[in-house]
Amino acid sequence: MAACTAQVLSLYRKLMKESNKFPSYNYRTYALRRVQDAFRANRSVEDPKMVEQLLNQGRDNLDMIRRQVAIGKMYPTQKTIVEG
């Protein structure tokens, strides 16, 4: 279980780090909030099969975030008032 916990924490850190790379404030805050909410919602899951399934889903989401960040950097937009 310790290895599993380490994998979950590693995935969480990677997701948060990648989500912070969004150039757009709105996308960045949305992605960060979604990652936090998903991990909080599944905090009590202990079934190894379910944990593995959630890890795979998280890895897929990490790949998606990386692609979206790359696309967002290719097509920059004007900063919002919140971004200053």
UniProtKB/Swiss-Prot annotation:
Which terms under GO biological process does the entry name?
A: iron-sulfur cluster assembly
Query: What cellular component terms from Gene Ontology apply here?
Result: L-cysteine desulfurase complex; mitochondrion
Q: Name one Pfam family in it.
A: Complex1_LYR
Could you name the domain of life of the organism this protein comes from?
A: Eukaryota
The entry sums up its family as follows: Belongs to the complex I LYR family.
Q: What is this protein called?
A: LYR motif-containing protein 4B
Native organism is Salmo salar (Atlantic salmon)
